[in-house]
């Protein structure tokens, strides 16, 4: 597939491979590259950054809007979380197809098609009349956004060449880091000033600009001979994940996991996922995801760590803005500003993590990162349980979490491919990228379900919904309130705050426990650097 673009971008076979998802094949023949970053390359990088930042910012923007969706659509957190879950499932679906699609259509056309799909999805989201259509249109966005990062890397790898790739990726990485910092602020400001629909409408001029610039700047490339696509694998994995998560997400409304409306889709989804695993294991030619890579112990441990870590991490991240808005009574704009310490922590740790990984290899820095995430998330949970004000506990926890993310996510991607042969790097990178998205999608659904369960078991919160004391109240939407249902105690507001804080604290503690559990597989990651060891080759 188009994994050759990444392999040729590596200076030497013995060097540590770059942990990315490839999607481009260079043209046959030799090509000479200048040593400096010329104007043409910087223009190409600028277009790639414009589109990729748009997709990255959109994720953080939508997380800030979760409570607004609950109020405007009269829905629950478990249902609204599908605006994130559906998007991440779409990412997990298209990432394995990126290499085949770029071979089939060419990287230039695929990039432009992905930008167009994301922009069209943004427009549809902006006009969605109900939560169901908003979720569906978010999936459309995800199909476009999932292609942008791997295709952008393939284009940059082809245009930069091996000697300039590191420098151009450093240039590209700066605005990519600013996305998670600026996204919550932008989203909060747009929601407060113009309404939630503008968090999607703002993508239209950016997407159209990226589309026009790509048509002008990117060199034309012809489609190449592509591998046979694993349609069966795609038809098993995507519906399996969606059906399983739909069943789990239905449990709060049913009151029990034993309800048939929960069990039937959950069991059906698990059966489809099991069938996908069996299909991928025995498919010898070009499976959607090469499950045989799990025979490599380092690959198995890195992917297990990434999946569970994403489950706890992404699930808790979804609820951070909701907690700030619902319990601390912050506006969307304020909650966006108060999440900034997380991005600042990540920016601070980036150069340190990179230097440590180069000197020590990924295993040790991954352990440090996981411990930092657990410490930060635990600190945040402690502040929530104590009903603490924002300062100083909560920003401290967020900053530590941000540092831990940088020290764990990227090194884990490196650990997943460092023992693979060059021809296996593409598949290994795809595998861990998919598991990151799958873990994140399960985490967003699971944590929202747990929070909804906590809400449903609180009589105070249930009463508050009726009297418009929470954003999802019936009275707030014009429903009649029976005065006899109101509580007699005088400290109702204090008790409501206690129950809300307790509900969020329980979920954050569970997320912390999941993060801590990843120390077990992470402890067995290979301690040597890639240049010091090479695992036996698996079959191609």
Swiss-Prot record:
It is a multi-pass membrane protein. Pfam families: MFS_1. Keywords: Cell membrane, Membrane, Transmembrane, Transmembrane helix, Transport. The chain crosses the membrane at residues 45-65, 78-98, 117-137, 171-191, 198-218, 229-249, 262-282, 304-324, 337-357, 365-385, 390-410, 431-451, 505-525. It is found in: Cell membrane. The keyword Chaperone does not apply. GO terms for molecular function: transmembrane transporter activity. GO terms for cellular component: plasma membrane. Belongs to the major facilitator superfamily. EmrB family. NCBIfam families: efflux_EmrB. This is Multidrug resistance protein B homolog. It comes from Mycobacterium tuberculosis (strain CDC 1551 / Oshkosh). The gene is emrB.
């Amino acid at each position: 597939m188009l994994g050759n673009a990444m392999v040729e971008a590596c200076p030497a076979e013995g060097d540590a491979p770059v942990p990315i998802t490839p999607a481009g094949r260079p043209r046959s023949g030799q090509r000479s590259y200048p040593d400096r970053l010329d104007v043409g390359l910087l223009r190409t990088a600028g277009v790639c950054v414009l589109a990729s930042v748009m997709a990255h910012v959109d994720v953080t923007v939508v997380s800030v809007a979760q409570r607004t969706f609950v109020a405007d659509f009269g829905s629950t957190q478990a249902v609204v979380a599908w605006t994130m879950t559906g998007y991440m499932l779409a990412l997990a679906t298209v990432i394995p197809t990126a290499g085949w699609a770029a071979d089939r259509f060419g990287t230039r056309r695929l990039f432009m098609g992905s930008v167009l799909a994301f922009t069209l999805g943004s427009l549809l989201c902006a006009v969605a009349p109900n939560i169901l259509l908003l979720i569906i249109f978010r999936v459309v966005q995800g199909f476009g956004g999932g292609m942008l990062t791997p295709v952008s890397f393939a284009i940059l790898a082809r245009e930069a060449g091996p000697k300039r790739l590191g420098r151009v990726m450093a240039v590209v990485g700066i605005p990519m880091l600013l996305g998670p910092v600026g996204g919550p602020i932008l989203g909060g400001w747009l929601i407060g000033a113009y309404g939630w629909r503008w968090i999607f409408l703002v993508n239209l001029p950016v997407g159209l600009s990226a589309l026009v610039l790509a048509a002008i700047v990117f060199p034309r490339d012809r489609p190449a001979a592509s591998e046979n696509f694993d349609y069966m694998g795609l038809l098993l994995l995507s519906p399996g994940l969606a059906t399983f998560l739909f069943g789990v997400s239905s449990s709060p409304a049913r009151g029990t996991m034993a309800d048939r409306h929960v069990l039937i889709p959950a069991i059906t989804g698990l059966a489809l996922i099991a069938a996908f695993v069996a299909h991928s294991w025995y498919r010898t030619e070009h499976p959607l995801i090469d499950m045989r890579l799990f025979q490599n112990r380092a690959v198995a441990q890195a992917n297990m760590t990434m999946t569970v870590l994403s489950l706890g991490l992404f699930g808790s991240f979804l609820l951070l803005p909701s907690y700030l808005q619902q319990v601390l009574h912050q506006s969307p704009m304020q909650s966006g500003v108060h999440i900034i310490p997380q991005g600042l922590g990540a920016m601070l740790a980036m150069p340190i993590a990179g230097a440590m990984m180069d000197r020590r290899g990924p295993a040790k820095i991954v352990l440090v990162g996981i411990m930092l995430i657990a410490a930060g998330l635990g600190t945040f949970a402690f502040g929530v349980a104590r009903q603490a004000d924002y300062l100083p506990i909560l920003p401290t926890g967020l900053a530590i979490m941000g540092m831990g993310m940088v020290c764990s996510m990227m090194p884990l991607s490196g650990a997943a491919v460092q023992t693979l042969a060059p021809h296996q790097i593409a598949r290994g990178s795809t595998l861990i990228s998919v598991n990151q998205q799958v873990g994140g999608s399960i985490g967003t659904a699971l944590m929202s379900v747990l929070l909804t369960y906590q809400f449903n078991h609180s009589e105070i919160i249930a009463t508050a919904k009726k009297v418009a004391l929470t954003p999802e109240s019936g009275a707030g939407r014009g429903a009649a309130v029976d005065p006899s249902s109101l509580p007699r105690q005088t400290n109702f507001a204090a008790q409501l705050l206690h129950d809300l804080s307790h509900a969020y604290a329980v979920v954050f503690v569970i997320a912390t426990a999941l993060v801590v559990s990843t120390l077990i597989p992470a402890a067995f990651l290979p301690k040597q650097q890639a240049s010091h060891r090479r695992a036996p080759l698996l079959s191609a």
